[in-house]
């Protein structure tokens, strides 16, 4: 069917779930902190360390990628990949530098869970 002259066909763009999550991690500071806080809360469970590293990798992807992170932290890109990869074993100092460079320091992430927990008990 031809469109009347001057009218444009409407197209609907839908994002995948992953794209939507990346957009929220990029644009919404509170969401990014909550996302990492949930992963941190589950770190002692089976697979929890890997889940936390996945959450960090997703935030890195959303906020400019590993090359950008390397520039902002002064850490070598290959070392970042190795540390934060599945099964990686990053030093605490690496995690702290990475989170700080991403704009969500560890203290924000850790204290957020404490704030959420106290709100639940207050209700």
PLM feature segments, named:
Residues 2-55, 115-122:
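N-terminal flexible/basic segments that precede or flank functional cores
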Residues 59-82:
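Short alpha-helical DNA-recognition segment
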Residues 92-109:
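DNA major-groove recognition helix of helix-turn-helix/homeodomain DNA-binding modules
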Residues 63, 89-92:
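Residue at a beta-strand N-cap/secondary-structure junction
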Residues 83, 112:
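Residue-level "edge-of-site" marker
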Residues 34, 38, 58, 97-101:
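Short, residue-level hotspots on alpha-helical faces of the histone-fold
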């Amino acid at each position: 069917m031809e469109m009347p002259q001057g009218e444009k066909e409407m197209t609907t763009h839908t994002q995948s779930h992953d794209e939507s999550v990346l957009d929220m991690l990029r644009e919404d500071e509170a969401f990014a902190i909550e996302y990492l806080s949930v992963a941190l809360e589950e770190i002692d469970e089976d697979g929890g360390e890997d889940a936390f590293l996945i959450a960090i990798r997703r935030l890195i992807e959303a906020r400019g990628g590993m090359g950008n992170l390397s520039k902002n932290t002064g850490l070598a890109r290959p070392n970042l990949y190795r540390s934060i990869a599945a099964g990686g074993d990053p030093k605490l100092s690496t995690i702290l530098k990475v989170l700080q460079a991403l704009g969500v320091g560890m203290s924000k992430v850790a204290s957020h869970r404490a704030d959420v927990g106290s709100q639940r008990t207050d209700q």
